[in-house]
Curated annotation (Swiss-Prot):
Its EC number is 3.6.4.-. It is found in: Cytoplasm, Cytoskeleton. InterPro entries: Actin, Actin/actin-like_CS, Actin_CS, ATPase_NBD. It comes from the Eukaryota. This is Actin-2. Actins are highly conserved proteins that are involved in various types of cell motility and are ubiquitously expressed in all eukaryotic cells. Belongs to the actin family. It holds the Pfam family Actin. GO terms for cellular component: cytoplasm; cytoskeleton. Keywords: ATP-binding, Cytoplasm, Cytoskeleton, Hydrolase, Nucleotide-binding.
């Protein structure tokens, strides 16, 4: 890496959205849905220069004639051909760069299978010919973005939620807990409870409307039972939302019933611990000497932690689970939707990080297994 002027690229591939941009920037340049769409019928759009696949926003806007697929499920890449299309789109259409001219920092889910990191490494060097690359664990990058190296990160996105204890920059794999309950499930649940109110949302297009309602109007109640009582006795919590066709719908207790599932997964018919318990359980799996540092540095990250009221509720729930004298601090940075990306941007622009990159030469000498030695 002789030439220091070459900007590294940072790509955070989430289950729902892909965030991409340049190291040193304070926000990603490109944020688009992690979807690949293929035409349902051959030759519907003859003469329109029909492509065999569409990625991101273009796939979203043409979804009526396409079959949409998410190549990342629960944070983990399951379809590599489509993943390659997303990366190609990221470099050439969104960032408009030549990947062979820039080091690339990618992110991965905690507990990502070893074969997956090797596959990512191989694709970067062999398909995109990058000069250097690195794979960072998402939760660790979020922690860096908050200015810490020790803490526990509750990272909740569209496809998966993880509680990840981190000590001096290293994720502690034995204590990481995964919860397959995230934004997509909350959108589905909101669709279901709005149906009970007499509104029907079923298609994928309507699902996007519900996701928008969720993002604009939902919040987490500090005391769920009390909030339910308030909602029943007055209309003070009701809000209206205008649908694209001009119809106006009113939503009341659905506003907080939907995200309550994060704390009570039984609402979704799931028998798992809520986000507060899984964070507590992850702390309890750590050495007793570092727990104090984890309680005092509990960092929220990802789009599904963006609900108003979530930090106060976490504080209340963890306080009731933890020893009574313990100091508990929930950190909820306003930019937490992008904190994984921001952490990657910070890391890739540090002068001390420059020797951490896996170079093309090292890859050629050692093969994809080098990723386990250099990225941990």
């Amino acid at each position: 890496m002789g030439d220091e002027e070459v900007q590294a690229l940072v790509v955070d591939n989430g289950s729902g959205m892909c965030k991409a941009g340049f190291a040193g920037d304070d926000a990603p340049r490109a944020v688009f849905p992690s979807i690949v769409g293929r035409p349902r019928h051959q030759g519907v759009m003859v003469g329109m220069g029909q492509k065999d696949s569409y990625v991101g926003d273009e796939a979203q806007s043409k979804r009526g004639i396409l079959t949409l697929k998410y190549p990342i499920e629960h944070g983990i890449v399951t379809n590599w051909d489509d993943m390659e299309k997303i990366w190609h789109h990221t470099f050439y259409n969104e960032l408009r760069v030549a990947p062979e001219e820039h080091p690339v920092l990618l992110t991965e889910a905690p507990l990502n299978p070893k074969a997956n990191r090797e596959k990512m490494t191989r694709i970067m060097f062999e398909t995109f010919n990058t000069p250097a690359m690195y794979v960072g664990i998402q939760a660790v990058l979020s922690l860096y973005a908050s200015g810490r190296t020790t803490g526990i990160v509750l990272d909740s996105g569209d496809g998966v939620t993880h509680s990840v204890p981190i000590y001096e920059g290293y994720a502690l794999p034995h204590a990481i807990l995964r919860l397959d309950l995230a934004g997509r499930d909350l959108t589905d649940y909101l669709m279901k409870i709005l149906t009970e109110r007499g509104y029907s949302f079923t298609t994928t297009a309507e699902r996007e409307i519900v996701r928008d309602i969720k993002e604009k109007l939902c919040y987490v109640a500090l005391d769920f039972e009390q909030e339910m009582a308030t909602a029943a006795s007055s209309s003070s919590l009701e809000k209206s939302y205008e649908l694209p066709d001009g119809q106006v719908i009113t939503i009341g207790n659905e506003r907080f019933r939907c995200p309550e599932s994060l704390f009570q997964p039984s609402f979704l018919g799931m028998e798992s611990a809520g986000i507060h318990e899984s964070t507590f359980n992850a702390i309890m799996k750590c050495d007793v000497d570092i727990r104090k540092d984890l309680y005092a540095n509990t960092v929220l990250s990802g789009g599904t932690t963006m609900y108003p009221g979530i930090a106060d509720r976490m504080q209340k729930e963890i306080t009731s689970l933890a020893p009574s004298t313990m100091k508990i601090k929930i950190v909820a940075p306003p930019e937490r939707k992008y904190s994984v990306w921001i952490g990657g941007s910070i890391l890739a622009s540090l002068s001390t990080f420059q020797q951490m990159w896996i170079s093309k030469q090292e890859y050629d000498e050692s093969g994809p297994g080098i990723v386990h030695r250099k990225c941990f």
